[in-house]
């Protein structure tokens, strides 16, 4: 059996503008020095277009470009350049809004590198970090020039300190909203409306709206915050068509685990892989299952502390880990599924309008009442889900906006519930001109529920969601190909997978979650300051240690040769000479009598 894996190669210079140099942009020497330190030889197309418009013409910018095209530097460089030219004044001059805490930290680290040679004259505050109230007050009183935050955290801080001289946005000259489409899909529209009253919108406020897609919701923000913006669209879809290879494989509920075991144990995918699951328990079940075969992996979900999540992303980007199991269980997706289903029903109703007119009014009323009952049931389920997920971080988002570097493959172990979520998951690979592969497991409707322990509720709609994904990808010029595994060669691994899967009980999953949380809380809180002072010791902190299920089976870690496909077995002819009988030289050799130990005091002669 073989799986067509796409190896990541060096970045093709698709996005670079070779005709433009950094010196030609008339930037501050300190900023140029920082850019050179980062290793940026030439600006990208989006940067060479946006930076002159922002600095020379003072235009608002609306930029649409794919991930890895340099959108962050396109707004970060003009912000810092303006502050360096005008000098550090009293008051906050720039606000950067991002959808998730992980992305907030990445933007903060990037901007810190850009101000490396500014002699600490520019202050940057990452409001999404875990600060105590006293520490946060002291940082805000210093009036940092740049504030990076999620919309909800910024509004929460503004309302908590309203009427106090702690945080004041009346001096802001630049507003940046990064990943606009994600911010709107996360439900931050109300927060953006509240933010409008705190900002000097009617004055000279320069705005950057950065997004991978442009939709109708963007027009609302454009009307609120922009005046005669310059709209930049980097049409790079065609150049990326050959970079991303997409497959889907129809399989059973248990065979998902079996195929995952075979793929990772035989190293069929070369390079780093992100595996997406739809809930937290699912992630731990897969981790406990794989680690019985000696397959090391780490978990990323919304229950982990923010410091641990950020460290996992950083270590993954440094190639410390090669297999990451990420939970993508955002409640927005459930709402989108309901909206899509309702939209389809409305479309079907409109198509059959003529037939329905001939029916009795009583039937229409009954249908209306049934729809109301179904709607109430959906609301009840959503309320239960909200209560159940109260401990999760609402600003967690691993499939959206986070910069995972050099990801060779994205494996959708659980198919996402919407086509939009699929696009964001797949967007973690084939970034910045590099190649990548996406493989999605799909459960046919007739196979759902046959294996209760391995079953997942959202799998009922896998085929419907797949059809939407295929249609959307075809519109964008992409193709998702079916992939057929040679199950005859996989069957030999089934009995071992059965043993390992039975060992992963619900009790083992619960104990693993508690153990993981305890370890991560200790690493995140108590040792945070120690690791800051001793960065070398941070390397010893690993997140892919075995969690040890209740039943450890050491023999599963070794794969016998007879289970491997013929192409992967060792060549018997080249094993060398192996004697039939073991070498018996010395077997009958008499044991030499060792000299008795002598006591030097007793043997001492006068």
UniProtKB/Swiss-Prot annotation:
Residues 359-370 have a biased composition (Low complexity). It is found in: Nucleus, Nucleolus. It comes from the Eukaryota. Residues 586-596 have a biased composition (Basic residues). Its EC number is 3.6.4.13. A motif (Q motif) lies at residues 20-48. Residues 52-232 form the Helicase ATP-binding domain. Residues 371-382, 597-606 have a biased composition (Basic and acidic residues). One of its GO terms (cellular component) is nucleolus. Keywords: ATP-binding, Helicase, Hydrolase, Nucleotide-binding, Nucleus, Ribosome biogenesis, RNA-binding, rRNA processing. Residues 336-397, 586-606 are annotated as: Disordered. GO terms for biological process: maturation of LSU-rRNA from tricistronic rRNA transcript (SSU-rRNA, 5.8S rRNA, LSU-rRNA). It catalyses: ATP + H2O = ADP + phosphate + H(+). One of its GO terms (molecular function) is ATP binding. Pfam families: DEAD, Helicase_C. Residues 336-352 have a biased composition (Acidic residues). It is an enzyme of class 3 (hydrolase). Its main location: nucleus. Residues 261-488 form the Helicase C-terminal domain. A motif (DEAD box) lies at residues 178-181. Signal peptide: none annotated. Belongs to the DEAD box helicase family. DDX56/DBP9 subfamily. The Q motif is unique to and characteristic of the DEAD box family of RNA helicases and controls ATP binding and hydrolysis. ATP-binding RNA helicase involved in the biogenesis of 60S ribosomal subunits and is required for the normal formation of 25S and 5.8S rRNAs. This is ATP-dependent RNA helicase DBP9. The gene is DBP9.
């Amino acid at each position: 059996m073989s799986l067509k894996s796409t190896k990541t190669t060096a970045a093709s210079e698709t996005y670079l503008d070779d005709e433009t140099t950094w010196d030609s942009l008339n930037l501050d020497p300190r900023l140029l020095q920082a850019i050179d330190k980062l290793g940026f030889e030439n600006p990208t197309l989006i940067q060479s277009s946006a930076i002159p418009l922002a600095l020379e013409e003072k235009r608002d910018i609306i930029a649409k470009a794919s991930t890895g095209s340099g959108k962050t530097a396109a707004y970060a460089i003009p912000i810092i350049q303006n502050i360096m030219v005008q000098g550090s004044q009293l008051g906050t001059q720039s606000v950067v809004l991002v959808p998730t805490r992980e992305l907030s930290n990445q933007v903060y680290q990037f901007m810190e590198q850009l101000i490396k040679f500014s002699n600490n004259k520019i202050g940057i505050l990452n409001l999404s970090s875990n600060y105590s109230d006293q520490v946060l007050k002291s940082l805000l009183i210093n009036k940092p020039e740049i504030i990076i935050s999620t919309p909800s955290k910024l509004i929460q801080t503004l309302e908590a300190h309203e009427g106090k001289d702690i945080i004041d946005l009346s001096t802001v000259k630049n507003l940046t909203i990064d990943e606009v489409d994600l911010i709107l899909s996360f439900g931050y529209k109300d927060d953006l409306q509240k933010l409008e009253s705190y900002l000097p919108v009617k004055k000279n406020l320069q705005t950057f709206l950065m997004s991978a897609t442009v939709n109708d919701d963007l027009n609302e923000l454009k009307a609120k915050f922009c005046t005669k913006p310059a709209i930049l669209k980097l049409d790079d879809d065609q150049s990326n068509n050959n970079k991303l290879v997409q497959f889907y494989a129809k399989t059973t509920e248990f065979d998902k685990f079996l195929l995952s075991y075979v793929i990772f144990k035989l190293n069929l995918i070369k390079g780093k892989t992100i595996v997406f699951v739809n809930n937290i328990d699912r992630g731990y079940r897969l981790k406990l299952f794989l680690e019985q075969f000696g397959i090391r992996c780490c978990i990323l979900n919304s229950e982990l502390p923010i410091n641990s999540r950020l460290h996992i992303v950083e270590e993954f980007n440094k190639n410390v880990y090669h297999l990451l199991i990420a939970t993508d269980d955002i409640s927005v997706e459930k709402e989108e599924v309901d909206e899509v289903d309702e939209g389809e029903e409305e479309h079907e109703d409109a198509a059959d309008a003529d037939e329905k007119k001939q029916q009795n009014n009583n039937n229409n009323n009954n249908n209306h009442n049934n729809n109301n009952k179904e709607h109430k049931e959906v609301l009840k389920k959503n309320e239960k889900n909200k209560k159940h997920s109260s401990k999760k971080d609402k600003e967690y988002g691993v499939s959206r906006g986070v910069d995972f570097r050099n990801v060779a493959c994205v494996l959708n172990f659980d198919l996402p519930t919407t086509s939009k979520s699929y696009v964001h998951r797949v967007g973690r690979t084939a970034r910045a001109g590099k190649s990548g592969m996406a493989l999605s497991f799909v459960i046919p409707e007739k196979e759902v529920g046959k294996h209760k322990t391995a079953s997942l509720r959202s799998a009922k709609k896998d085929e419907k969601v797949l059809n939407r994904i295929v249609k959307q990808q075809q519109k964008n010029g992409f193709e998702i190909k079916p992939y057929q595994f040679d199950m005859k060669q996989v069957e030999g691994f089934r009995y071992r997978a059965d043993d390992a899967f039975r060992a992963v009980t619900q009790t083992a999953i619960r104990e693993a979650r508690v153990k993981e949380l305890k370890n991560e809380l200790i690493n995140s809180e108590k040792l945070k300051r120690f690791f800051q002072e001793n960065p070398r010791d941070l390397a010893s902190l690993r997140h892919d240690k075995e969690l040890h299920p209740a039943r450890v089976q050491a023999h599963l870690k070794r794969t016998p040769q007879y289970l491997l496909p013929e192409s992967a077995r060792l060549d018997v002819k080249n094993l060398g000479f192996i004697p039939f009988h073991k070498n018996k030289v010395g077997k009958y050799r008499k044991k030499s009598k060792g000299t008795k130990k002598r006591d030097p005091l007793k043997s001492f002669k006068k």
